[in-house]
Amino acid sequence: MVKILKNLLYQLNKGKHGNIMNEAFWSEPQLIIELREILRDKRYFIVIDDIWDYSVWETIRYALIENGNGSKIITTTRNAHVANQIGGVYSLIPLSLIHSRKLFHQRIYGDEDKSLPSHLAEVSDIILNKCGGIPLAIITIAGILASKKGMTHEYWSKVSRSMGTGLEDSPQIQKMRRILSLSYYDLPPHLKTCLLYLGLFPEDHDITREYLIWKWVGEAFVRKEHGKSLYEVGENYLDELISKGMVKPVEFDGCSKATTCRVHDMVLDLITSLSNDEHFLTAVGGQQLMPLPSKVRRLSLQTGNAEDVRLLSTVSFTHVRSVTVFDQALNLLPGISCFPVLRALDLSDCEQVDNHRFKGICKLFHLRYLCLRRTSVTEVPKQIGNLQFLQVLDISLTEVKVLPSTFVQLTQLVYLNVSAWTRLPDGFGKLECLQNFPGITVSYPSMLHDLGRLTELRNLKIIKFIQCGENYDEPFLECLSNLVSLEKLEVNYYLGGPDFGLSSSLSPGPQRVYSIDMLRSTFYAVPRWMSSLSCLSALEITIRTLAVQDFEVLGKIPSLTDLYVWVLEPTGERPERLAIDSRYPFRCLSVFRFWSYGMEVVFSRGAMPNLQTLDLDFQVRKTKDLGGNFYFGLENLPLLQRVPVKIDCYCTEPGEVEAAEAALQKGVDMNPNKPMLNILKYGEMG
């Protein structure tokens, strides 16, 4: 910090402080006082480049006095979290292909308007696409290609193929790596490990969030933190790598959370270089340019050509702890007996993996992670019980119909993913460490007793209930009462009885649950016990008919921000629309999606004071029959911003659709916040 403040003083007043960098007597408070004195009556414009920590900014901000003279400060940072803390963020977007070409040509020829020879045009665009619009990458690669030998198509193609897999160690590449490595060396040790691990994926490979995090867990990269599941901790790791710009998000969910990510080619090049230096991970395939080490700890098999076979023949597998095989490289995988200390094995999408190979895998007694997703496995051998250290198991999208009784010996499992048709053995409640169970079919009520014993469950998805005339209500409620750690619940194809929601609370109940999705199930009413779930922020539910009591329950859920209600049958005997007003607090609700054949609600003054998005779907004919008009009270929602509406025009009389549209438009026009209305009509007769 002292060095930064000295540098500021030197640049602001070289006449007085020309030798300040060599003066040892300055303390941080003295430097701050001197800076404030120099700037006291000045109008200044200062750029602080590459801030890594918010505490550094706080000190600098205090030193740069606010004197009311219209001064400006610009800071740059690679850390999105730091940027958000400082405020006033302007996010730079990557250069377009056109501007990338201009920068590229400027570096090659010294003239941005000069064009490349025709034989280099196509390969240059491939190179620029790999640079991803990042100026540093473009300048670095252009510096390599600007050499005399660089003007040949053969050489440019070689550079293009090598990007992301260990580029040649030219001075330009070394300089770029040094710049990028600043971000790497700023990471804490556990994030360095997680980042280097991404070198196992091929270039431009899309990586799903959940898949990556559970691989980290299986590799023991994720540290336990009090009050958090291993998956939550892993999510924080990934979010931090994205925030620091080391991982690029590709796809997002409705909450703007990255569901798929990718490693930029230039970062992958850095990872490959560092990984080779530290003997962290060895990737076989792609454009591998370096000889393989004699000993390997983590192995990624990406392609299976003859050269790769030759390379692997020189490798010892006795120290390999992790193997990931991509489908086209399965022929490279030697016998399982070659990996005596293997802890993680990923054969997902390798269709040639069958039952015989699975039986051999059950001899890998040190395994912590096993993924056989989308393979040709149809049976789980009884020897599966030998894998006493197994924490992560994924056998989803296979033809496995039943798990053996020995499966319940896997008492260290924290993640289990099976196909919808896979039947669990009796006593699976012994898997008491299980935290994530993203797919179970409940075939009979007694299964819910075992499910209720999994008190560490954070994430549960019930794919379906096989009814067979059984009444699941009582055992299901008892099960939910016992799942005290549950945070996310999805229940599909459940037909709740009339008594399912009568209890006002579940004791002790899933008090930590923040998301419940019951949209593909059906209930007579909103269960009363939901109002006792203090952490519940997102709820999707389908009910048969709508009653005042439903909004009394929903309105009392204190943290509810996102609500989706689907009503199957409109209440024909109701004389007027159900008014939502200040009696139903909905203090935090920001998104309300309401689907019903007939629009049964009207918003009164004081309703949903923080609502920003109102998503409606209704049938014009039924709505007109129920209420006689299309007035919904949209002007009474003070913070409303968006009103997407789907209108079913089936069986409408002339003018009714236009009347509905006009009423909706009038409602938003009367709203002081002037929300945006978007109407989509369907079911119109030609």
Which ranges hold each PLM region?
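Post-nucleotide-binding-loop coupling segment downstream of the phosphate-binding loop, primarily
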Residues: 1-34, 214-216
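Surface-exposed helical/coil interface segments that assemble multiprotein signaling complexes
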Residues: 65-67, 115, 144-194, 199-363, ...
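A short helix-loop-helix "switch/interaction" segment in the helical subdomain of ASCE P-loop NTPases
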Residues: 121-133
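The conserved phosphate-sensing helix
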Residues: 130-140, 188-193
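Non-core capping and flanking segments associated with repeat-based/extracellular domains
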Residues: 433-438, 450-463, 469-686
